[in-house]
Amino acid sequence: TATTEIYTLSLHDALPICAMEKQSKKDLNIMYKRILVPTDGTPMSEKAVEGAARFAKSLGASLVLITVVEPYSYTNLSEYRPESIEQYDERVTAEAKDRLADAKRRCDEIGVPSTTLMVKSFSPAEAIIEQSKKHDCDVVFMASHGRQGFAAVLLGSETQKVLTHSQIPVMVYR
């Protein structure tokens, strides 16, 4: 039977935990070369980006920073919309680019190579999982909750979905 060991990762002022089959740090260095890190601009996801960057630096890994923006919703068309589709797209794209630029800057300051992705999807969890496969990521490193905050007691709903459906390890930053 495989044994499981809990690794505590000292990443500055927080204590994220990862459960996995027993591995040595050398094995972790081999296992994790590309880490997908979702960010939605919330303080928790910003801390997760910094934690992921410190973790990646200790392993010599790189980060793939992703933000998922919701496409314009055509539901409730009778509802008053203060902005056009084009205005909405421009606004959410600008916000996403700013969010990714901030995350990349933090990675650069820590000295970790990173690339950025902006994806449009009504399902952030599905987009995260799809992009982790597309970019050959070894692990997803994400905040325990984001914009939904208290939608779930312990974990955000998107984090729960990624944990449930991802075929690669998921590290949850708390």
Mark where each language-model region is.
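Small/aliphatic-rich secondary-structure junction motif
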Residues: E21, K26-P82, R106-T115
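Glycine-rich phosphate-binding loop signature in dinucleotide/nucleotide-binding domains
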Residues: Q131-C137
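A short acidic, glycine-rich active-site loop
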Residues: S84-D98
